[in-house]
Amino acid sequence: MSFGEARSAWRSNGLPGHSVSFRCLLDLDGDLADELDVESRRLARAAATALTFEADAGPVSLADWLDQVPDGPGVLVIDGVLALSSRVGDRIATELVGAGDLLQPLWGGAEHLLACEITWRALLPMRFALLDAAFVKRVRFWPQIGQALLRRAGRRAINLDVQRSIAAQPRLEVRLALLLWHLAGRWGKVEPGGVRLPIPLTHQLLGQLIAAERPSVSHALARLAAGGFVTGHGDEWHLRGSVEHSLPSMIDPVAGRADRIVATVGARSTRGAACEPHQLRW
């Protein structure tokens, strides 16, 4: 799809979003640009262009945009944090995606026997890039770009597996502490005495991330705050100390379980970062 065709589709079909423009993806995504050497980057700049659009914080409809890329990699998140929620029956599970994550079209098929509703909510102002089949054709001479996008899809899957493992913890305080430190590894900012997590996370949203009800989350957060582990509110959270100092007092010392979790999760938290997703093993 050319820029003219995409812009025409945006206008005629009423696609959501604003500030639609055609941009060089390598200028917007520094990590992607770093996949290429200087000369390759110079040659690829003119080809690695994509339609970009923005969305304000709040509910976002991405289904129509995803319909524009049935044969392409998908919609790439450039900036912001997006809550992607899946509803089956009366239960909702949520995943947070951010810069570098790739969203694919919602494929249906006979193997899907359960009705599942997908919704998106921008927690922060968002910018996206539309990577369609035309984009793939333009960058075919630089396979590093496609390989990097494939690795990112794998990274997102691993992050989701980590979140599922966190949700399996029996104690809700432990689930919340692990989740917040996990999110801090990606979006946290080091501050004196701990890490600041500048993402608007309501109690309801936290519950949807770790399979818990909102009232229980509120009580668990109050207990964490009373212990000096976590402070803050819906717009910003502060994680005090380091994860290896916080978890042992929250976990029953059964068969050294607390020590195993601390050894993996807290390896780098003293420097203000949570562990890498693949380091979580218990």
Describe these PLM feature segments.
Residues S2-L66, P70-D71, D101-L102, G108-A110:
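Cyclic nucleotide-binding regulatory module and flanking cytosolic helices
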Residues D71-G89, A99-D101:
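Glycine- and acidic-residue-biased ligand/ion/polar-headgroup-sensing regions
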Residues G74, T94, R127-A129, P198, ...:
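A residue-level structural signature of the nucleotidyltransferase/glycosyltransferase Rossmann-like core
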Residues G80-V81, L176, V217:
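Hydrophobic structural packing positions in well-ordered secondary structure
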Residues E95-I158:
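Cyclic-nucleotide recognition modules
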Residues Q144-L209:
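Polybasic "coupling" helices that flank or enter modular domains
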Residues G185-W282:
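Phosphate-/nucleic-acid-contacting segments
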